[in-house]
Amino acid sequence: MSRTAEVRRDTKETQIRVWVDLDGTGASEVSTGVGFFDHMLDSFARHGGFDLKVETKGDLHIDMHHTVEDTGIVLGQAIKESLDGFKGIRRFGHAYIPMDETLSRCAIDLSNRPYLIWKTDFRTPKVGDMDTELFKEFHHAFAMNAGACVHLECLYGTNSHHIAESGFKALARALRQAVELDPKTHGHAPSTKGVL
């Protein structure tokens, strides 16, 4: 069973193509025009064990908001599409990720009931050229479109680069657990409702 998806989204603000293979090796080709964001998506693929291709062309002459948020939308849609109705997966995942002085944790439920709890504060308004407020926008867009309930929290940390990166890695590792095939589900959705 191939767990891949390709999603395209074209608006007046952004043109985006995302391809994902949930059963890949962590290989990635990412180009969004935002260097630090590319780094985060590469890290997401590597630590999630997903093969990922992201091509985003956005209205960066205005700012990075549309580029980052819309990439989250399309990545979430691609993950959801590749899961084929959430059948046969473990559904839940969690991870603690340390990065030097920072510790982040993420818990995820692939329930098709999207929600985001975000408890992450940054000490600086930017990491490189990227506004730190955009990290919440990305994670919200991702959760809503992946059908994922995501709780992401930085327990402590002072370096904004480390806070952002440990959060992306925590999401990746939690998602890696949640999308794993579970033989005990016998290919069904892991829910008493029988469907997610």
Curated annotation (Swiss-Prot):
Q: In which pathway does it act?
A: Amino-acid biosynthesis; L-histidine biosynthesis; L-histidine from 5-phospho-alpha-D-ribose 1-diphosphate: step 6/9
Q: Quick one: a GO cellular component term?
A: cytoplasm
Q: Which Pfam families match?
A: IGPD
Enzyme Commission no: 4.2.1.19
| Gene3D superfamilies the record matches | Imidazole glycerol phosphate dehydratase, domain 1
Q: Which UniProt keywords apply?
A: Amino-acid biosynthesis, Cytoplasm, Histidine biosynthesis, Lyase
From what superkingdom does this record's organism come? Bacteria
Q: Does the keyword Cytoplasm apply?
A: yes
Known catalysed reaction(s)? Answer: D-erythro-1-(imidazol-4-yl)glycerol 3-phosphate = 3-(imidazol-4-yl)-2-oxopropyl phosphate + H2O
One example of the protein's molecular function in GO is: imidazoleglycerol-phosphate dehydratase activity
Q: Which GO terms describe its biological process?
A: L-histidine biosynthetic process
Q: Which SUPFAM superfamilies match?
A: Ribosomal protein S5 domain 2-like
Family per record: Belongs to the imidazoleglycerol-phosphate dehydratase family.
Recorded protein name is Imidazoleglycerol-phosphate dehydratase
Q: What is the lineage of its organism?
A: Bacteria, Pseudomonadati, Pseudomonadota, Alphaproteobacteria, Caulobacterales
What gene does the UniProt entry assign to this protein?
hisB
